[in-house]
């Protein structure tokens, strides 16, 4: 699941690498137009579930419908500090499958690490690509 889908590139990458289904959520109508166009260009629309909702509402709906995820990718706009709340809701609603992972893309790795200290997650990898930092998380024990 790509919670802040933007162009849909991450969800499309998941699908191109064999994921059975990719949820791509973004609250921006403009972003969703790009996601739809990009998914059509790649001919992967059959397995793409595109949702135009705020992340909080989408996570609530996923819980209500019993949907769980193996991989959850979070790349909220860098100027919004909402990863901590998204992770909190994902854990609270039990949306991560056993052995599932959360990947956070951020421009401020130290802030995200500090934010995650209160969760039941452990950082098992992190990588830096230019300005972007990727933090890979899994539930402890």
PLM regions with names:
Residues 1-141:
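Class I S-adenosyl-L-methionine-dependent methyltransferase catalytic core
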